[in-house]
UniProtKB/Swiss-Prot annotation:
Its EC number is 4.2.1.20. The gene is trpB. InterPro entries: Trp_synth_b_CS, Trp_synth_beta, Trp_synth_beta/beta-like, TrpB-like_PALP, TrpB-like_PALP_sf. It comes from Haemophilus influenzae (strain 86-028NP). The modification N6-(pyridoxal phosphate)lysine is found at residue 88. This is Tryptophan synthase beta chain. One of its GO terms (molecular function) is tryptophan synthase activity.
Length: 397
């Protein structure tokens, strides 16, 4: 891969493991991205869309009630307030501008929780691009509000009935479509994973989350946080938060994977702590695998975290010890979901609830410890209210 413009690897992780027919397409994308990063006109248009369409910068909110009787200050980076309801809108706008720059006339995407699909649909509507979204049939059912939003904004939503009918299967179908239609189509990948250059592109189009957080916390508290905490599925909201803090050694980076029904049950989506390295989705990264090397089914109550692998930069940060990766069960995430709603009047996405749950766990372990924590509230929970209601009233997800 020595002829790429950017390093395709993070340590041993990453790469471009795709059919030969897609290699020149990925290199074209890399070339366009490098040129766009150095083009003031592109950057100005992207910045304008982020400010005047998406609503950046997002707020940094101090939790007034969750930390009562403790010495912790807990802030939430409010990506739930972004247009579209989650952090996904940031990088979607950047990628569609790139697609237009390359002369592409059609956008495809995959989605799990539906937030990336909604972000893609709204941006395609505004920027006048046709849009097809692949979504696991199981996720179509449990995220029906987002499916309606996507279709309302003109997107074609394709339920994927193969495999586990979840995010990994939607990713595979999107890849197949792209392989057949790459001349006209841009695959708007939704997370900081997949083949190079997607992990780098998505990180660069999400890193304003951490940049804003750093400015805001310094303004509010006069110092950097002790830790920033974010949920990790593929890893885009987390890498967006972490990037500007990587070179701040006194700031702990904590990624929270889904432990599902408990790691010991086998029903989880925590490859960083409990998987072997494999090749999947065009990249080399930790991958949940069966004994004979087949991709294992991941599980989480949160559709957006239900993914058997993880972005390569997270794998690298884990390997070198710069970031810590922990896991939170469905039950713990559901409790955090309710706690934030009840005590702060904010309904978080189930994805974000995993990060919040770990922050609350840290606080409860040592309530007398003076600490400054920031949780990336990556999305709002409107999409999850029916799922949570069903679970709390005796059903199952």
């Amino acid at each position: 891969m020595s002829d790429t413009l950017l390093n395709p690897y993070f340590g041993e992780f990453g790469g471009m493991y795709v059919p030969e027919i897609l290699v020149p397409v990925l290199k074209q994308l890399e070339q366009a991205f490098v040129e766009a990063q150095n083009d003031p006109t592109f950057q100005a248009e992207f910045a304008d869309l982020l400010k005047n369409y998406a609503g950046r910068p997002t707020a940094l909110t101090l939790c007034r009630n969750l930390t009562k009787c403790t010495k912790t200050k807990l802030y939430l980076k409010r990506e739930d307030l972004l247009h579209g309801g989650a952090h996904k809108t940031n990088q979607v706008l950047g990628q569609i501008l790139l697609a237009k720059r390359m002369g592409k006339t059609r956008i495809i995407a995959e989605t799990g929780a539906g937030q990336h699909g909604v972000a893609t649909a709204l941006a395609c509507a505004m920027l006048d691009m046709p849009c097809r979204v692949y979504m696991g049939a199981k996720d179509v059912e449990r995220q029906s509000p987002n499916v309606f939003r996507m279709r309302l904004m003109g997107a074609e939503v394709i339920p994927v009935e193969k495999g586990s009918c979840s995010l990994k299967d939607a990713c595979c179908e999107a890849m197949r479509d792209w392989s057949a239609n790459y001349e006209t189509t841009h695959y708007l990948l939704g997370t900081a994973a997949g083949p190079h250059p997607f992990p780098t592109i998505v990180r660069e189009f999400q890193k304003m989350i951490g940049e804003e957080t750093k400015r805001q916390i310094l303004e509010r508290e006069g110092r950097l946080p002790d830790a920033v905490i974010a949920a990790v599925g593929g890893g885009s909201n987390a890498i967006g938060m972490f990037t500007d803090f990587i070179d701040e050694p006194n700031v702990r980076l904590i990624g929270v994977e889904p432990a599902g029904k408990g790691i010991e049950s086998g029903e989880h989506g925590a490859p960083l702590g409990h998987a072997k390295v494999g090749i999947y989705f065009g990249m080399k990264s930790p991958l949940m695998q069966t004994e004979d090397g087949q991709v294992e089914e991941s599980y989480s109550v949160s559709a957006g975290l239900d993914f058997p692998s993880v972005g390569p930069q997270h794998a690298y940060l884990n390997e070198i010890g710069r970031a810590d990766y922990v896991s939170i069960t469905d039950e713990e995430a559901l409790n955090a979901f309710q706690e934030l709603a009840k005590h702060e009047g904010i309904i978080p996405a189930l994805e974000s609830s995993h990060a919040l749950a770990y922050a609350l766990k840290l606080i409860k372990q040592n309530p007398e410890k003076e600490q400054l924590l920031v949780v990336n509230l990556s999305g709002r929970g409107d999409k999850d209210i029916f799922t949570v209601d069903k679970i709390l009233n005796g059903g199952t997800n």
